[in-house]
Amino acid sequence: MTPAERILAKALAASPMKSADWSSIQAGLRDRAFFSATVDDARRLAVMREAVAKVASGDLSESQARLEIREALEQTGYTPPQDKKGGLQDLSSQRRLDLIIQTNVAEARGYVRYLEGTSEGALAAFPCQELVRVQGRKAPRNWPEIWKGHGGQIYGGRMIALKTDEIWTAISRFGHPWPPFDFGSGMGVRDVGRREAIRYGVIAADDPPPKMPPEKRPNFNENLADRLPKGREKETDLMLREAFGAQVSIEGDMAKWNGSLIRDMLAGGGTPRARLGRASGALIARIEDEDIRSLAEKNGLTIPRQWMQTHALKHEKPSGKGGANLPLSTGDFELIPSLWRCPDSATRHGDGELELSLETLDGGILTLGVNLSKGTPTTFHKRKTRAPSHSPKG
């Protein structure tokens, strides 16, 4: 897996949750999600994910990525709060965009390097690594104190530990044993060979090569699960259900991220049906018809895998008069949870049916028909409404 592939494999996690809320969620749940604090529009996240992946692969510069994201923000009507303009809470500011781009690119590269550096052969030759500064900072954090405060040892003035040591996860704001270890920290790692590690006394000459337990070598193709934060189980449970609905399943004190559910189902895997849950408050507020509103409040929506695959085949190519119906991409199907939770419009369409619409950033408008009495989708199509100025990848 390349850094760009890791980024594109992450499921869009549109949510109004703030940074502190995300930080309270265990790393196992955050790891499969592409998110940014308070970004609750999946269309914006889709462009951010694509732009960040292109920076990771070298196909875009950071300045070009900022431009693409700003265009998407403008198209979706984003206006920063007047008192937050230019700061980190302004999604269009250079500070916020640099944070999004640089943190995600660094995380993806750190993840790939971690997998390479913890293979059996790599651990035999380079059993340890050193925490080092890779970028200067005007006001650097005191990393030696952070290191020692979490139980790390100093060897000849250097912060060195086995790659399998818990210290790497302990010093990380994100709960990962690979860099970055904090927002804008400027810190990275350097491999330390066996001879050098013996010379500094980190390991003994007769110590066998360390072995990385399988559970510490993350498999990105597996559904990730983690325990809810101890003492905050109920609070976190409610927060996750409100923000993501069926994208997170919770059993007891364990929560599992199902954010890639839609893509997995389109590919023929995953569950036979995706349960998106009951209508959100945002959707209810958009429904004017009282009878339809009552049905939406009562019944949820379940998306069958066969229905999705049928519509994917049906809309592989333009259809209708003058090609009015556009092809549906994987990215379009990924927007179904957003269509259900927070559409641009929701109108009655027949007896017990609701038609939801959402404008896309490539000049189209997605329309999802829902039979509220049965809690199932009826139609799904995309039509062109304007000339696109930016085309996000599906």
Predicted regions and their residues:
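A short, surface-exposed interaction/processing loop segment used at functional sites
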Residues: 363-394
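Short proline/glycine- and basic residue-enriched helix-capping loop/turn segments at helix->loop/beta transitions
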Residues: 340
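Domain-core detector
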Residues: 1-182, 192-289, 293-301, 313-334, ...
